Amino acid sequence: MKIDTSNFKKGLSKRLTIGREATKEYQSYFIPIDQLFFNDQNGRIATYIEEDGGEARGCLEVGNFDEYNDIIAGYIKASANDNGDSFKKTKEDIKSKGQRIPGVILDDGRIIDGNRRFSCIRELKKETGDPKFEYFECVVLPSPKTKNEAQEIKLLELNIQFNDDEKKDYNRIDFLASFYNDTRNTASPNCIDKITYCRAAGRKPAKYDDNKRVVETRLDYLEWIGKPKAFSYLKKDKLDGPLEDIAGGRKKMSQEEWNEKKNTIYSYRTFNGQGDRTRNIRAVIKDAKQDGSIYQSVNQVIENPDFLQNLPNALKIKDKKPTTPEETEERTSYLKKLQDTLDRAFIKGSKEQSAKQYREGPKNILDSVLDKIKNIHPIELRNLPEGSKNEILKQIERIEGKLEARKKACDDDLA
């Protein structure tokens, strides 16, 4: 069904930049909300559709927009970063003042801009029955017929997204799902290159590279646990923060180092459930780069042939939902043994690291002092005023006295 704007009342105009055209005003129209639906090609919404096991997709395929929109609206509200505060504020604003900012849709009913406003209007219609909430004010654009036209719509969506407060309640996983579809998913007709994305989104290349690294790490981890591209799993298991930390550690390693050490890092993150999990995984990641005591101790457990052999089964057990009390007890007991083993390895490595720091502490301090002294050039000292030279000589004498006492302490122990 194609929306014919000649049948509907005109609204405000909205400034848009589409493709290579100059920014200009586009006329908006009041379109019935029952003819509109959330854009299933949007990365964030595609994640929700993946999550629900096909119910939303089934509704969309048979044209049941109302039920489809109910499902997606529920996901949008549930995943907001601010516990729904922005949604409530927008809803109250529209209730008292009406919709003041037009959205953007395609002529097949897909919403390109205005998801929150559309959701609020739908709720207000159900709650009040007021006819004024039967319409969504929006610019209506032609649906793309070519890959180039599809990319122009995607660039418009990005441009609006990064200049619109409505999008700031996106959680990080939803944003990165969109980023993946926009920049890494070559199967998508909307996939665009780095330069084009940065220009449309107003983002610096360094930020693009950081997002790319995090997305690649998430995809790699999902592949590792046997759930390729299942972004919804990351949300369910609250893995947004830990995988950001892991991606940050990956940035400091060569590809060869990363390939060698990622199994230990992924395994520890997946099965460790003891203590301060965030602090501990950060310690393992940091230590991995230096081949330190913590990493080596954890790695020794994970690279043990028995652990490696049981890893696929352990991943299945962790992911499987128990259906009986016996299965629950068995699963809990199995995972607890793994957690205890990893926890003991972490504690052992931490103690070894502390002992090493204690042993090497004095030497590290002296190394630091020596480096600082090397930065004082003799020529600088020769050119100082007489008074300054005398002060420095006194300082040197005090330092020599302190060093002599430390040297004597070492000599006494060695005697």
Feature names for model-found ranges:
Residues M1-K132:
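Short, charged/polar connector segments at secondary-structure boundaries
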Residues M1-K14, Q27, Y208, I373-I376, ...:
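An acidic, glycine-rich, mixed-charge low-complexity segment common to nucleic-acid enzymes
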Residues A78-S79, K126, K132-I225:
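Amphipathic, charge-rich alpha-helical segments that serve as recognition/docking helices
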Residues R116-P131, R279-Q296, E303-P305:
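Short active-site loop/helix that positions an aromatic residue
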Residues G129-F136, G202-D287:
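Amphipathic alpha-helical "recognition" segments
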Residues N190-D240, A288-Q339:
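C-terminal intrinsically disordered extensions
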Residues L243, A247, K262, P312, ...:
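Residue-level detector of alpha-helical secondary structure
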Residues N313-I396:
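Charged/polar low-complexity intrinsically disordered segments, enriched in acidic residues
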